[in-house]
Regions:
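Intrinsically disordered, low-complexity polyampholyte segments enriched for Lys and acidic residues
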Residues: 6-9, 369, 375
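Intrinsically disordered, low-complexity serine/threonine-rich segments
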Residues: 19, 368-370
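Short, well-ordered alpha-helical segments enriched in acidic and aromatic residues
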Residues: 92-93
Length: 377
């Protein structure tokens, strides 16, 4: 019969297995995970990731490498990050783009309705510096990327001597972006028009096709998806879904208004283990970017845990300010900062999917099938 003196020993023996299990789990969770998947390993070898890069990936950090490009005005990056969640959870979170994207570098964001309408852009407010610059905007000399028609709109529809210039400018900007998305949905790349902010007009569709025509191999060929991005709105791949959103991004340079077209393309039972490919096609940006395309490959593969996957990212963009002596000095700086921004964004994706709790300092409000989000306070 147990006595009062030996009862603690029995209790200790009962607790011992749980203590050991807890310790083992703690060590396992704190240790890097050595991902081993034939498809992803092949891609990473092809991109010449180092042993240090792989250790960083296994430790849960995003790894980003700058890629060589054939022209100076193009930047390209390959990235990988391991995410402790299923690809399905990622897609579910990502589809709620307003909550997913918002953060310190994204003070404003909204998703367009299935049939875009003015209310989708109601919260959009241009940065004060952009409003001031628009007062001096002329074809061939404008601080913002605008078509000749848009420059005329700001000149003709805004009373620049009025006390409510900001309200008028923002109203014109919202109308301009709404028209852009509607026309793009009807006519595709032809509706993207030309930028007339510099001496030489720049065809946005031409810049996008140059990005699309890159010879750098993709992690996995997706010809139907690429053809759709080029031929939109025709021949959408079976099973693909899409949406459009706008945002104001601010990562330390000029805050930039961007409009993006997102296509989520599922790959059923692909031998590679890639379950989805996500394309993010830039339609417009007020600064820096002439065109941009990001492709994300969600590779579950045969890793140690089906609840984990690896996200492979390939980003290409055409940018300003890389010509001449000044451009040769600036390009390495722009490239380094852009690479750091891509790395930071991939780690943001990881946090959003693994935790995904919206910060209390921001507020979102649904507007039918659209969403808008602005920084609170």
């Amino acid at each position: 019969m147990a006595t009062a003196a030996n009862r603690p020993d029995h209790a200790a023996r009962r607790l011992f297995p749980w203590a050991v299990l807890t310790a083992v789990l703690a060590v396992a969770l704190a240790s890097p995970i050595a991902y081993s998947d034939a498809f992803v390993d092949t891609v990473l070898r092809r991109e010449h990731l180092s042993a240090a890069d792989l250790r960083a990936r296994d430790a849960g950090r995003a790894v980003v490498k700058a890629l060589d490009t054939s022209v100076r005005q193009e930047l390209a990056y390959f990235g990988v990050v391991a995410i402790n969640a299923s690809p399905e959870r990622f897609i579910d979170r990502f589809a709620d783009i307003v909550r997913f994207e918002r953060g310190p570098g994204v003070p404003q964001i909204g998703r367009f309705s299935a049939s875009p309408r003015a209310e989708d852009l109601a919260p959009l407010a241009l940065p004060p510096a952009d409003i001031a610059a628009l007062a001096k905007c002329r074809p061939g000399d404008c601080a913002l990327k605008l078509s000749a028609d848009a420059i005329s709109r700001f000149r003709d529809r805004v009373d620049w001597s009025s006390s409510n210039v900001s309200l008028q400018v923002n109203a014109v900007a919202r109308d301009m972006l709404l028209d852009l998305v509607r026309k793009y949905q009807a006519r595709g790349n032809a509706a993207l028009g030309e930028y007339h902010d510099d001496d030489e007009p720049l065809s946005v569709a031409h810049e996008f096709r140059a990005v699309l025509a890159s010879s750098h191999p993709l992690p996995l060929p997706v010809p139907r998806l690429l053809a759709y991005l080029d031929d939109y709105p025709h021949n959408r791949p079976a099973g693909a879904t899409e949406f459009f959103y706008w945002s104001v991004v601010d990562f330390g340079l000029k805050p930039t208004v961007r409009v993006n077209h997102v296509v989520i393309y599922p790959l059923d039972a692909d031998p590679s283990g890639v379950s989805h490919v996500i394309a993010i096609k830039q339609l417009y940006a007020t600064h820096y970017f002439r065109s941009a395309l990001e492709l994300r490959f969600l590779a579950a593969g045969q890793g140690p845990d089906p609840r984990r996957f690896q996200l492979l990212s390939l980003t290409r963009s055409r940018i300003d300010g890389t010509s001449g002596v000044r451009g040769s000095l600036l390009r390495p700086i722009i490239s380094r900062r852009s690479r750091n921004a891509v790395r930071g964004y991939l780690e943001h994706l990881k946090r959003q999917v693994e935790v995904g709790q919206p910060p209390a300092s921001q507020a979102c409000s649904p507007a039918a099938d659209a969403q808008v989000c602005v920084e609170a306070g």
